[in-house]
């Protein structure tokens, strides 16, 4: 009877449309910083290739000891936060206690990666992930060895008992006193890609996640005074004795996260009939309106960009306590963490707003598209960083809007990338970059400014058509880089397809420069005229002085790697007159010569700032007075260095 019921469940699930389903129940022990959990996973193979193993992500084992891949690469530091606490208390783990498959005990068939001889031969992760001396396979991956392959259309029911201990929070998930942020907290099935096998990379410092869409039913039992926020919608809340159980349901999502704290303050709002919940710590009530305003700006902007409103039935914004900001700035489906400091920030300093918009935006460029964050970080971080700036521009106008300082969106990303002198491309796996800073620059900043340039080149209407097509074709799938590029090609054509593909897949830079801008008084004729008559010098000088004509020469140069792109050149004369020239981009440089009654004041390449990705704006303008030009250059470089300092502090890895 039990076996028949199990088969009935498998059949019912296979007819539901999704190939993955999680039913999870957990009990939180705040004193021990642990949860005891049980999950039932039903997984269906929807590929042509039989599956002989089932890998599980056990991400929280990244905090098991100081020799894991994550802690080896990070040294216990993430963004600006460090792993702290008493020696054993600061670490965490996810321990698999028992496994059954289709009702049969499979506990002996489960192995952590560290228990497997030559785990590289399983082909669940790439060989280059563990080539460094200090970086070896760890327990962030576990393998269930099946007795029989799961063929196409077949489903398997897996039951797992597990214990998770939270680490002291410094990187996304963990605890601070009685506050808990549960991200990547349960055993999660990797993504099966048929002939390519399982995609189940190790958990690196810079890599995030990749998962299949699933339905989740989750019960969370906590002490009665605790408030829980989670992915999905709350189905029920029941108190029994000194315990309270929350039940949540989420459909068609790629992850499930939750938070619990006995000091949460709660605020509610609505957007387009979508309920919005804000969880924030005591003392930050003055930020509530500001946080909801940013969230609504994000909802509006992403709907406008893609042509599709937020599709889920609820959204929760979590503002962690200031002492636990390691939990801030992280995305999960239907729930994200932002962050406000305990002190008041001027309304014109919109870094908290930027963080909220960015993290919400990952519900599109990560959660809805489910791109592979391990291998193509730019597809979520880069596209989403562009969309963040788009949201700031639409919702606020300026990123920084103070009486003495105005900084428009996209500026920090352009300045950030302009400081990078290497030749790496964004299209690399997250662990393959030479440094954390280069990963951030190429995964966030470079795609942002090249997408902004693409928008300027094709126009906002056509640009939004690209994203609308991308959503229509690839939402709720796992699009590849070529899928995105193909949408650019279909809407904007081959030229712009080549442009954005070159930007992402190579180390190319774009750099227009004014090579020279000079004026010379036209000299009077001397010697013999063209009829071989001697020229009367005094007469020529008098006539020339009356005319006083200048011969002007402006040379614009393409110093970058992108060819055949048009650029406009503005020439401003000292009398205020303006002249505009256009170069079609053919060749390496173009000279413009003309006569005028006034000399050149300055020449400006790309005055409308079409090329937001121009690598060096200092050389876009050249004054006829060289000393002025030197002063402009020094000022620009000083400003770039100062803003880059703040970029490193505020935007690395959000």
Where are these regions (language model features)?
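Solvent-exposed beta-hairpin/edge-strand motifs
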Residues: 55-115, 119, 123-124, 183, ...
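Acidic/His/Gly-enriched intrinsically disordered linker/tail segments
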Residues: 381, 385-449, 453, 457, ...
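Hydrophobic helix-coil surface modules that form long, contiguous segments used
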Residues: 189-198, 205-357, 386-389, 398
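Catalytic Zn2+-binding segment of zinc metalloproteases
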Residues: 360-376
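Extended, low-hydrophobicity, Ser/Thr/Pro/Gly-biased non-transmembrane segments
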Residues: 77-93, 97-98, 104, 134-136, ...
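Beta-strand-rich binding/interaction modules
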Residues: 230, 497, 510-606
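Amphipathic alpha-helical substructures
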Residues: 399, 440-526
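N-terminal, polar/Ser/Thr-rich
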Residues: 13-36, 77, 176, 497-502, ...
């Amino acid at each position: 009877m039990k076996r028949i019921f199990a088969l009935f469940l498998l059949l019912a699930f296979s007819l539901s449309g999704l190939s993955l389903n999680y039913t999870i129940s957990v009990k939180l022990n705040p004193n021990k910083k642990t949860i005891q959990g049980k999950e039932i996973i039903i997984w269906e193979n929807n590929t042509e290739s039989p599956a002989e193993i089932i890998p599980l992500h056990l991400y929280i084992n990244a905090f098991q000891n100081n020799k894991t891949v994550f802690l080896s690469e990070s040294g216990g530091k993430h963004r600006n936060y460090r792993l702290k606490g008493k020696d054993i208390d600061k670490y965490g783990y996810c321990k698999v206690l028992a496994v059954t498959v289709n009702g049969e005990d499979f506990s002996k068939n489960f192995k952590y990666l560290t228990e497997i001889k030559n785990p590289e031969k399983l082909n669940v992760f790439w060989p280059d992930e563990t080539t460094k001396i200090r970086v070896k396979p760890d327990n962030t991956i576990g393998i269930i060895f099946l007795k029989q392959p799961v063929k196409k259309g077949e489903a398997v029911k897996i039951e797992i008992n597990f214990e998770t201990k939270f680490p002291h929070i410094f990187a996304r998930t963990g605890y601070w006193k009685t506050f808990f942020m549960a991200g990547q907290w349960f055993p999660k099935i990797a993504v099966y890609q048929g002939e390519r096998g399982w995609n189940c990379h190790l958990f690196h410092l810079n890599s995030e996640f990749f998962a299949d869409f699933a339905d989740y039913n989750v019960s969370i039992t906590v002490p009665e005074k605790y408030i829980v926020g989670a992915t999905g919608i709350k189905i029920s809340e029941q108190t029994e004795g000194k315990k309270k159980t929350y039940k949540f349901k989420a459909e068609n999502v790629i992850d499930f996260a939750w938070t619990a704290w006995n000091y949460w303050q709660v605020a509610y709002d609505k957007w387009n009939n979508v309920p919005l919940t804000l969880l924030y710590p005591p003392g930050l009530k003055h930020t509530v309106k500001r946080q909801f305003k940013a969230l609504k700006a994000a909802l509006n902007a992403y709907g406008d960009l893609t042509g599709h409103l937020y599709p889920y039935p609820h959204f929760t914004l979590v503002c962690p306590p200031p002492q636990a900001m390691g939990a801030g700035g992280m995305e999960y489906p239907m729930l994200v963490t932002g962050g406000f400091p305990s002190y008041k920030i001027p309304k014109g300093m919109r870094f908290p707003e930027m963080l909220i918009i960015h993290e919400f935006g990952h519900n599109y460029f990560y959660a809805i598209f489910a791109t592979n964050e391990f291998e193509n970080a730019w597809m979520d971080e880069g596209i989403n960083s562009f969309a963040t700036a788009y949201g700031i521009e639409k919702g606020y106008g300026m990123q920084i809007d103070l009486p003495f300082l105005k900084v428009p969106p996209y500026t920090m990303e352009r300045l950030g990338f302009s400081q990078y002198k290497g030749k790496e491309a964004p299209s690399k796996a997250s662990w393959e970059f030479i440094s954390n800073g280069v990963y951030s620059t190429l995964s966030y900043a470079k795609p942002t400014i090249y997408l902004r340039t693409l928008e300027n080149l094709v126009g906002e209407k056509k640009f939004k058509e690209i994203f609308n097509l991308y959503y229509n074709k690839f939402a709720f799938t796992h699009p590849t880089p070529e899928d995105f590029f193909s949408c650019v090609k279909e809407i904007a054509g081959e030229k712009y397809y080549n442009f954005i593909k070159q930007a992402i897949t190579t180390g190319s830079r774009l750099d227009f420069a004014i090579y020279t801008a000079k004026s010379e008084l036209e000299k009077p004729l001397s010697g013999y005229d063209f009829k071989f008559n001697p020229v009367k010098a005094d007469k020529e000088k008098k006539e020339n002085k009356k005319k006083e004509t200048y011969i002007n020469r402006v040379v614009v140069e393409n110093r970058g790697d992108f060819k055949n792109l048009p650029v406009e050149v503005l020439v401003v004369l000292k009398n205020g007159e303006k002249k505009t020239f256009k170069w079609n981009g053919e060749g390496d440089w173009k000279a413009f010569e003309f006569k005028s009654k006034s000399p050149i004041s300055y020449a400006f390449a790309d005055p409308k700032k079409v090329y937001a990705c121009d690598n060096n704006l200092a050389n876009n303008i050249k004054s006829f007075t060289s000393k002025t030009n030197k002063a402009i250059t020094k000022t620009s470089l000083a400003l770039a260095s100062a803003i880059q300092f703040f970029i490193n502090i505020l935007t690395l890895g959000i």
